[in-house]
């Protein structure tokens, strides 16, 4: 990337070599705050303004999608109206209608997939410690918690459908890595944040939601010689298809 304060230097290089800049790409993150989006659009259009040949602005990063109940999903109508006014004002001022590009991948597919694992082991470090659930899954399918403390919804599916009391657990993966923790503190992969779940037992199925984006594609597949997990698509008619 290029720091925005270096725009004048870039313009000099463009002029020196007779180049034309057709597209400006800025990375604004994946937030849901309309005010942040508006500020990012304004700053990005200021860059476009400096390159007369530019006709496309790509706001990289995409839309925030809430995976957890306390997370806010981007309101496309709210941010869209503000962005529209900024682009229209730019067109009136410069005579240039700018094409907007946004990367919507996560927004579309994040909550379309889930990991279905099995509880392999249970252990405890005593009254002053934690109760642990160990799965036959982990970094090999989802590195987001280990990398940046990402949060995912989780559920225990008791065998035989029985009802059990809730209990607080630290959920761990099966990799030989101290960082293979699936319940880190939010935004802190080094921290631990117990999750309240139905009481687990060895052999129970365990679901991890919100895994449709940046999980399979970003995972440590085949690490520790664990084979790559199959990916199954449930079609609209209920039929199952093995994708991978």
Predicted regions and their residues:
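Active-site-proximal beta-alpha core segment in soluble small-molecule metabolic enzymes
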Residues: 1-56, 65, 71, 77-81, ...
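Feature marks short, surface-exposed loop/turn motifs that line or immediately flank catalytic pockets
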Residues: 30, 63-65, 108, 141
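Short connector loops at secondary-structure junctions
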Residues: 22-28, 60-63, 168, 172-178
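Short, surface-exposed, charge-dense and proline/glycine-enriched linear segments
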Residues: 49-60, 83-93, 123-138, 239-241
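Charged (often Lys/Glu-rich) extended helix/loop segments that serve as interaction or gating elements
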Residues: 97-244
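A cross-family glycoside hydrolase active-site/sugar-binding cleft signature
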Residues: 25-27, 58-62, 101-105, 136
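Conserved "cap/hinge" positions at secondary-structure junctions
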Residues: 67-68, 210
């Amino acid at each position: 990337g290029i720091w925005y304060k270096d725009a004048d230097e870039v313009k000099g290089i463009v002029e020196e070599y007779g180049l034309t800049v057709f597209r400006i790409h800025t990375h604004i993150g994946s937030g849901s705050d309309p005010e942040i989006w508006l500020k990012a659009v304004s700053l990005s259009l200021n860059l476009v303004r400096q390159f007369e040949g530019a006709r496309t602005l790509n706001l990289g990063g995409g839309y925030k999608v809430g995976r957890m109940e306390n997370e806010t999903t981007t309101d496309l109508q709210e941010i869209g109206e503000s962005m529209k006014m900024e682009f229209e004002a730019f067109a009136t001022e410069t005579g240039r209608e700018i094409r907007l590009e946004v990367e919507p991948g996560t927004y579309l597919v994040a909550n379309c997939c889930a990991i279905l694992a099995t509880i392999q082991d249970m252990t405890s470090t005593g009254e002053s410690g934690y109760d642990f659930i160990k799965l036959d899954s982990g970094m090999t399918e989802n590195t987001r918690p280990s990398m940046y403390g990402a949060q995912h919804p989780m559920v225990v599916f008791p065998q035989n459908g029985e009802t059990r009391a809730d209990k607080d657990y630290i959920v761990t993966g099966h990799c030989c890595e101290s960082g293979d923790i699936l319940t880190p503190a939010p935004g802190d992969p080094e921290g631990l944040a117990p999750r309240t779940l139905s009481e687990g037992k060895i052999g129970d199925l365990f679901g991890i939601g919100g895994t449709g984006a940046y999980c399979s594609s970003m995972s440590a597949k085949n690490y520790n010689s664990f084979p790559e997990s199959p990916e199954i698509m449930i079609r609209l008619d209920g039929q199952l298809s093995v994708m991978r």
